[in-house]
């Protein structure tokens, strides 16, 4: 099987965490709010890049060992090197959508949280069957063996980062669950 080079996800769904766990050299920091910051050069395809041709995107991909990506059309071109992040549990998906707004509050001017939640479900339903490799983050807080689903070589740094991320984000998930009634 070919190496993972693209982590495909929607904002808020732990894409930068999964990217970092695949390639620790891109890690910059874990913020007190639980957001993973990665090397900014790997974020190019996290936003709409209609200004880039497919060739530009291919050149960008070839310059990096892994990228964090929200462009499913481009990722599909490289589907054998793509890991898609999904979330089949609606309560967890709602949390991850809300988490996106926590880090990017300006997005509320473009799309409501309810619309983002719906758009994630539609996006996931449409794109998931097109990718052979995916990881469902529904059990990221409850599955003690979650990291084994990534099929990566683990070391102490990766395990510590994951556990630190999980500790911060699990608390905010439990707060979300309590206030949302889901």
Which residue stretches match the model-derived regions?
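PAPS-dependent sulfotransferase catalytic core
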Residues: 1-64
